[in-house]
């Protein structure tokens, strides 16, 4: 799954969602 990073962010390999005022570099989705 995703790793929460900040209040409204999740980020992990192959996973990213809402940015927290800055942009995350995201890998292609692995579903």
From Swiss-Prot:
Keyword Secreted set for record: yes
Tissues with expression: Confined to the epidermis and to the mucus layer.
One term under GO cellular component: extracellular region
Site residues by UniProt (Hydrophobic/aromatic residue important for potent activity): 8
Highest taxon, organism lineage: Eukaryota
Keywords: Disulfide bond, Hydroxylation, Ion channel impairing toxin, Knottin, Neurotoxin, Secreted, Toxin, Voltage-gated sodium channel impairing toxin
Keyword Disulfide bond part of the UniProt annotation: yes
Function, as annotated: Potent toxin, demonstrating strong inhibitory effects on insect sodium channels (Nav) and reduced activity on mammalian sodium channels. Potently inhibits inactivation of insect sodium channels of B.germanica (BgNav1) (EC(50)=11.1 nM). Also delays the inactivation of most mammalian Nav (human Nav1.1/SCN1A; EC(50)=92 nM, rat Nav1.2/SCN2A; EC(50)=134.2 nM, rat Nav1.3/SCN3A; EC(50)=12.9 nM, rat Nav1.4/SCN4A; EC(50)=14.6 nM, human Nav1.5/SCN5A; EC(50)=27.8 nM, mouse Nav1.6/SCN8A; EC(50)=123.6 nM, human Nav1.9/SCN9A; EC(50)=80.5 nM).
Family under the similarity heading: Belongs to the nemertide family.
Protein known as: Nemertide alpha-4
Residues modified to 4-hydroxyproline: 28-29
GO molecular function: sodium channel regulator activity; toxin activity
Species per Swiss-Prot/TrEMBL record: Lineus sanguineus (Ribbon worm)
Places the protein is found: Secreted
Further remarks about this protein from its record: Negative results: does not show effect on rat Nav1.8/SCN10A.
Swiss-Prot/TrEMBL domain comment: The presence of a 'disulfide through disulfide knot' structurally defines this protein as a knottin.
Covalent S-S links between cysteines: 2-16, 9-20, 15-26
């Amino acid at each position: 799954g995703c790793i929460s990073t900040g209040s409204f962010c999740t980020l992990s390999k192959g996973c990213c969602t809402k940015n927290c005022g800055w942009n995350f570099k995201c890998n292609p989705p692995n579903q």
